Amino acid sequence: MTEKRTEITIYTDGACSGNPGPGGYGIIILSEKKRQELSGGYKLTTNNRMELMAVIVGLEQLEIPSIVNLYTDSKYIVDAVTKGWAKRWRANSWKRNKKDKAMNPDLWGKLLDLCSKHQVEFSWVRGHSGNIENERCDKLAVKASQKLDLPSDLGYQ
């Protein structure tokens, strides 16, 4: 008998002032039993790294393999996962093609590993269009990016 997987909904967003510049991410995790909000930031990073970090940190919170409905306003993430780009980049030693390297291989590797543990359905939501949970994630991300004494994003530098 197989164990029924828990269904989880995750909303994520990343923000960066300057790109590169100080950045942050915001996450909302919804389950049958609770709502959890998380955020964090780095002093020098990019918007795409913060979008990726939001998804990674959200998935890292799940203690058991789960069915995840993940909502992000990052077409970069949705397309790279659903169109198989990220898996191809990894298979090609983190190259997009023969001469161009894939960006953020440290984070893409983590994300692909996490996706192999869970059943993740990625969905794109239009940013700043009134989606309440996405708007809240944006506020969390911006606030996190404005904190003092943010750590370094070692993968970026």
From Swiss-Prot:
Mg(2+) 2 binds at residues 13, 138. InterPro entries: RNase_H (IPR050092), RNaseH-like_sf (IPR012337), RNaseH_domain (IPR002156), RNaseH_sf (IPR036397), RNaseHI (IPR022892). GO terms for biological process: DNA replication, removal of RNA primer. Binds 1 Mg(2+) ion per subunit. May bind a second metal ion at a regulatory site, or after substrate binding. Signal peptide: none annotated. Its cofactor is Mg(2+). Mg(2+) 1 binds at residues 13, 51, 73. CDD domains: RNase_HI_prokaryote_like. GO terms for cellular component: cytoplasm. One of its GO terms (molecular function) is nucleic acid binding. Its EC number is 3.1.26.4. It catalyses: Endonucleolytic cleavage to 5'-phosphomonoester. It comes from the Bacteria. Residues 4-146 form the RNase H type-1 domain. It is found in: Cytoplasm. PROSITE patterns: RNASE_H_1. Keywords: Cytoplasm, Endonuclease, Hydrolase, Magnesium, Metal-binding, Nuclease. Its main location: cytoplasm. Belongs to the RNase H family. Endonuclease that specifically degrades the RNA of RNA-DNA hybrids. PANTHER family: RIBONUCLEASE H1. This is Ribonuclease H. It comes from Trichodesmium erythraeum (strain IMS101).
